[in-house]
Amino acid sequence: MRTHYCSELRNDHVGERVTLCGWVDRRRDHGGVIFLDVRDRTGLIQIVSDPERTPEAYPQADALRNEYVVRIHGEVSRRPDDSLNPRLPTGEVEIYADQIELLNAVHQQLPFQVSTADVESVKEELRLKYRYLDLRRDRMHQNIMMRHRLIQSIRRYLEDQQNFVDIETPVLTRSTPEGARDYLVPSRANPGEWFALPQSPQIFKQLLMVSGFDRYYQIARCFRDEDLRADRQPEFTQLDMEMSFMSQEEIIQLNEDLMRHVFKTLKDIDLPKTFPQMTYAEAMERFGTDRPDTRFDLELVNVSDLLEDSGFKVFSGAIKKGGQVKVLPIPDGNAKISNVRIKPGGDLFSEASAGGAKGLAYIRVKDDGAIDTIGAIKDNLSPEQTAELLERTGAKPGHLLLFGAGPTEIVNASLSRLRLALGAEMKLIDPDQIDLLWITEFPMFEWNADEKRLEALHHPFTAPYPEDEADLKTARAQAYDLVYNGLEIGGGSLRIYQADLQRRVFDAIGLSEEEAQDKFGFLLNAFNFGAPPHGGIAYGIDRLAMLLSGEESIRDTIAFPKTQQARCLLTQAPSSVDQKQLKELQIKSTAEPKN
């Protein structure tokens, strides 16, 4: 049907007869000569229909409109010197069409312009409703192709250079505790019983290690029924990897090699030979988050020990209750940040409130080195405390010190949000810089206040450090997350591979022996048959594709995404189903019917 893709043609093809297929991207009539930009998935080529040179094709060219589907037969010609277009790979040539076939027309008004030349902003709801048109647009087309090349580069590296095996794991499995809610699938063959769609292939990839497949990977589809944000989808894709007989440092080294391969292949970027590492405790202390953006220098300073005896009760009271007082020092903050922004109703107050803070205290360092603040703080800081505070924070004349006081998690969350907001506002972040950082030594568990129990910070199959096994409740996990400019792109750990230790971890999170056996008996039993030491990692393909494409939402790198309400605007899923189907499954809905 065609001899070439549109974007393949160059000067070397001049004089050749070619057949092309694609969509009319744009039509222009210049003094009776019709110019068509025809588009396929590789790009654009200019088609010329001249009534004097090729009169047999002119009527068809004259009838064409944007997004008509066509087949073009003609001869490749060099463009006149004054018509060269250096912005196009095909900008030195054009096709004189002597035959044009209309394969399909557009029978409705386009909801928005698709043309590569059109840069109008289109509402996302409209784009998602007509996603097949949106995907024709150059930006979206490039995003999907970047995603394809990302997965292609991963496969080639893991299989050709690292001897990994691609193995599929079940999509219909059983529901297990921990983590987000499962998507459940009723079993018609087994009434009253349910499958769950996998949140990850975690257990199956560990079983593959027990099975002797020492280097496994999969581009896996995963499902989580959770509240959505800009970077979350109910169904998502991850690169899933698991390796036997490798230490944590060996796994980290292999993954650094993988990232270097991906970035060099796709962006021609040379990443460093090794990526820096930072413990979870250090990241939380310095940046208030376990995924710090280290492209700029604003750091939090813990002054709890200095202010625990302060007469200012907001500070001393927070510390006595087991909380912290931290400072975010802002160079030149006096000139750039007004009190209005810090007080209730101000944007910085609102940013801190989003992290849970009830207010913001501040100190300004005046040009003469004296401090300016509210009386309650100034009156309750001794000269020695003030001097020590300025020294610890590195404050100089012109500095603004923003304080967070309260429960540690709230102080960290609120000040880390302020740090990012001010870093962006003050243009401290180089948008072209890439910082990759490993966060290590996570706590094994965190306290769930609602359920009044410990829960695994990552998942309950993560191995503790051997020296911490005696007291699991305070143990560090042999876990590692890879952070890209403040976004987590991958996370993994060494795994438990001994049944007794796995039972102890289940017990620590409140799973009884009976529950553990019911939910995970098959895994515990497998560990009794010679399970090797193993570990792994998983990367979010959607997020990686987003970052490599320079987008701000993963929805722009997924062909058919859901909205933040977990709906597909194209197919109108989810939808009600026929009562006959529910009857076969022995299910009855208690929800009110929708109009």
UniProtKB/Swiss-Prot annotation:
Organism field: Acaryochloris marina (strain MBIC 11017)
Any Pfam family hit: tRNA-synt_2
Protein name: Aspartate--tRNA(Asp/Asn) ligase
Primary localisation category: cytoplasm
Lipid biosynthesis among keywords: no
Description of how the protein assembles with itself and partners: Homodimer.
Positions marked as site (Important for tRNA non-discrimination): H30
Protein's gene: aspS
Sites where the protein binds ATP: R224, D225, E226, Q233, E488, G540, I541, D542, R543
